Curated annotation (Swiss-Prot):
Its main location: nucleus. It is an enzyme of class 3 (hydrolase). It comes from the Eukaryota. Transmembrane segments: none annotated. Keywords: Hydrolase, Metal-binding, mRNA processing, Nuclease, Nucleotide-binding, Nucleus, RNA-binding. Its EC number is 3.6.1.-. It is found in: Nucleus. One of its GO terms (biological process) is nuclear-transcribed mRNA catabolic process. Interacts with RAT1; the interaction is direct, stabilizes RAT1 protein structure and stimulates its exoribonuclease activity. The interaction also stimulates RAI1 pyrophosphohydrolase activity, probably by recruiting it to mRNA substrates. Divalent metal cation. The lineage of its organism: Eukaryota, Fungi, Dikarya, Ascomycota, Pezizomycotina. This is Decapping nuclease RAI1. GO terms for molecular function: metal ion binding; mRNA 5'-diphosphatase activity; nuclease activity; nucleotide binding; RNA binding; RNA NAD+-cap (NAD+-forming) hydrolase activity. Decapping enzyme for NAD-capped RNAs: specifically hydrolyzes the nicotinamide adenine dinucleotide (NAD) cap from a subset of RNAs by removing the entire NAD moiety from the 5'-end of an NAD-capped RNA. The NAD-cap is present at the 5'-end of some RNAs and snoRNAs. In contrast to the canonical 5'-end N7 methylguanosine (m7G) cap, the NAD cap promotes mRNA decay. Also acts as a non-canonical decapping enzyme that removes the entire cap structure of m7G capped or incompletely capped RNAs. The gene is RAI1.
Amino acid sequence: MTLQFPIQAPARYAGETEPVKRPREFACFSYDKDHKFRLDDSSMKWYYPPEIGTNLSHGYDTFIKHDDSVDEHLDSLLKTIADHEQQTGGPIDAHIVTWRGMLTKVGGSDASFLSLWFEMNATLYRLTFTSGYKFETLSTIPRPWGETTRDYIENRDNEVTNNKEQYCSVVRTGFGKSIVCLGGEVDAIWDAKPETPGKPINWVELKTTAEIHTHNDRFKFDRKLMRYWIQSFLLGVPKIIVGYRTQDGILSGVEEFSTLSMPQDVQRRKTAKWDGNVCIKFASLFLDWLRQSINDGGVWRIRRENKSDHIELFKVEEVGHGSIITDEFMNWRIKLSLNKDKPPGFEPSDAADAEPSMAEEPVPETASASGAY
C-alpha cells in the first residue's frame, strides 16, 4: 500500500505559523583529511575573508574529492548519538533522526521550482562544484586568526582543496509537534563556540554563485536563496556568505546575508516569491503525517517524482531496518534499555521514551525511513 501526502499551492500553507524550536548543538563529529570519522571538533574551520580576484578553478587538477557514490547511511550520526547517550545515561529527546539534507528538500518542496528528490549531477557540473569547495578553502583557516600564521593566510590559494574533511554539527530542533535530531556539515565559525552548551553559535555557511547582471539573474539567485536559507535555518547558522564568480571563474565579490532577515529581504525585492513560514509549516505538517504513518517496523521509502503533486510513502521491507540502523547502535540501545540504574536526576521525557524514526539522506531519487526500533 502506498500512502500519499498532498503538495498544495504555497498559499494554502499561509496563515497561522507553526512553532519552531531553536536548533541547539548537543554533539559534533569530524571527518579528517582521509574522511575518517572522529568524535571531536578537529575539522572545525574559522572564517577569514578571501582575496578578491582569485581564480576559483586554480587547483582543479589537484582537487581531492570525496567519493559520495558510497552510501554512508546514518552511521556517523548514530555513532555520535550513542556516544552522547553514553555520557548522559539516557536516549536523546527526538522523534525523528536524519541528515539536514533530507529536511532541506522537504522544506522546499512546496514551491514548483524545486523538485524534492532530484538534484544536479555532480559529473555534469564538476567545475561549479569544485569552485564552491575552492571558495571554502579560500575563506577558512584551521585555527583562530591569532593562532594562524600570516604565511598560511596569504597562501590559502595554494592549499589543496579537499572536501573529505568536514565538521558536522548535531542539533536538536523541532517543528510543530515533531522533535528532530539533525546532523549536517558546517563550513566555518565566525568567532568561537560559547562555553555554555546549547547557546547559539555564530556559524557561517559559504556559497558561490554566478555574478548578477540581469533581472533574470536576480530571479534565479533569489530562488537559490530559499535553499540557502533552509539549510542554514535548520542548523541554526546565522550568517551566509556568498562569493560571486565571473564566467571565467574569478572571485569578483563577497556578500554577507543574515539568515534571519533573508525571507523578508527576498519578498521586498518581489522577484522569486517564497515564504519562510510556508516552508516551515509544510515541513511541520509533513513530519507530523510521517510520524503517524510509520506505525510499525520494516523499511519505508519516501519519494516524490519530479514535479509530482504528492509525496509517496511505501514499505519496501516488511521486517528489519535494512542498512539504515547499524548493529552497533541497535546493540547500544538494547543495552541502554536493560540498564535500570539511571544517573541521579535523569528523567527522560515522553518524547525521549518514544521510538524515533530514522530517515537517511537518499541517492538522488529516493530516501528511506525505518519504523520504530
